[in-house]
Amino acid sequence: MKIKLFFAAFAALAAMSFTTLSNNARPWELLGARKVNYALDHDEILVTRAEGLFTGLQLKVKRGPVNMHRIVVHFGNGEKEEFELRENFRAGSESRVIDLPGNKRVIKKVDFLYDTKNLANRKGVVELWGRH
């Protein structure tokens, strides 16, 4: 009887350990980075199908501050989605996690519209991260 109880408890524990990952535990991948210019500017990061399917995006800013106005995500099926950020990012800061609509999506490219009035003469670097 004890052996049956042990195997039942072990099976229940094993079943609970195979649950899906939470949003914070899903793997993130660096999709690209751009050094920003001074004043109002536009950049894009190309992402290929080889990078995989994504459920979310996040921006990280390094070296210098950046005022990010918006990003436009172009998907593999031709659709595009615009996300207004309107946020001043300090060096070392990051955006909120931007959840992509629908299920996992193929991303072709991401366009950025930003400006910077960097008085410290350090150009900021914007990194684009994708969540699988």
Predicted segments, located by residue:
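Short, surface-exposed beta-strand/strand-loop-strand elements in extracellular ectodomains
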Residues: 63-85, 121-131
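Transition segment at domain starts
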Residues: 20-48
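Exposed aromatic-hydrophobic patches
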Residues: 43-48, 94-102
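Short, surface-exposed binding/anchoring microloops in extracellular/periplasmic proteins
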Residues: 37-68
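Solvent-exposed serine/threonine-rich low-complexity stretches and specific carbohydrate-binding patches
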Residues: 32-34, 82-90
